[in-house]
Amino acid sequence: MSTHSSISQPPLPLAGRVAIVTGSSRGIGRAIAIHLAELGARIVINYTSKAADAERVASEINDFPVREEITGKGPRAIVVQANVSEPSQVKSMFDAAESAFEAPVHILVNSAGILDPKYPTIADTSVEDFDHTFSVNTKGAFLCSKEAANRLKQGGGGRIILLTSSQTRSLKPGFGAYAASKAAVETMVKILAKELKGTGITANCVAPGPIATEMFFDGKTPELVEKIAAESPFGRVGEAKDVVPLVGFLAGDGGEWVNGQIIPVNGGYV
């Protein structure tokens, strides 16, 4: 009796596609980049200042077993330094992807973002910190989306996925500038999805709740972390692995009919 079905590997739904994942040297972005690579995509690992971390992610992906479905020249993953709030650097990031993989970009996941670990009230938020938050979180999402809208492959498979936050719904004190910067992105993506009519490119936001990353823990006491965990129906904060399956679904063909949506993934936190 043939044992082919028991030893055959599962199909790779993103084989032959190129994905840029911003802010993917660590945290949720890192987990997303690895997951999309596991689904067959070739990946741009983007970072701003953590070069060694980005190289480790790319090395991990490039060490994946060879699969014949993954076609195209070059490595499975490359590393590109780019500040998403700088237009020329965003353009260069797309240029690098097209050059390295000799193919158009199919998927943009914008995971780059910052959060002020001082958690100031709006009254105590400095103008400089406010501007910096919006520069990265909002302007960065805008610039990446703008470039993607003009350069992603059209006719099917084009995906723009922007990470926002469940803070736009929980409205916790101390997150004023951060939540506002993410809420702006959520409004923008709803309009973007309509403007992309006829291209076959979808645009959505994924809005995680509290996720156990370096950015989440920064500035929080153990007592505060426990309090946040207790607010979840699961009694814990989320992990990056709780977010990546949704991003993988949206990036694939099965997610085509999901468009212009803000999708919370927070375990019932909000």
From Swiss-Prot:
Keywords tagged on the record: Chloroplast, NADP, Oxidoreductase, Plastid, Transit peptide
EC number, as in UniProt: 1.1.1.-
Q: What is its main location?
A: plastid
Q: List the subcellular locations.
A: Plastid, Chloroplast
State whether keyword Transcription applies. Answer: no
Q: Which Pfam families match?
A: adh_short_C2
Q: Name one GO cellular component term.
A: chloroplast
Q: Where does NADP(+) bind?
A: 26-50
Q: Which GO terms describe its molecular function?
A: oxidoreductase activity, acting on CH-OH group of donors
Where is the catalytic site?
A: Y178 (proton acceptor)
Q: Plastid: present as a keyword of the record?
A: yes
InterPro entries, alphabetized: NAD(P)-bd_dom_sf, Sc_DH/Rdtase_CS, SDR_fam
User: Which top EC class is named for this enzyme in its record?
Assistant: oxidoreductase
Role:
Aldehyde reductase that catalyzes the reduction of the aldehyde carbonyl groups on saturated and alpha,beta-unsaturated aldehydes with more than 5 carbons.
The entry's family comment says: Belongs to the short-chain dehydrogenases/reductases (SDR) family.
Cross-referenced PANTHER family, in alphabetical order?
NADPH-DEPENDENT ALDEHYDE REDUCTASE-LIKE PROTEIN, CHLOROPLASTIC-RELATED, RE15974P
Q: What is this protein called?
A: NADPH-dependent aldehyde reductase-like protein, chloroplastic
Species annotation: Arabidopsis thaliana (Mouse-ear cress)
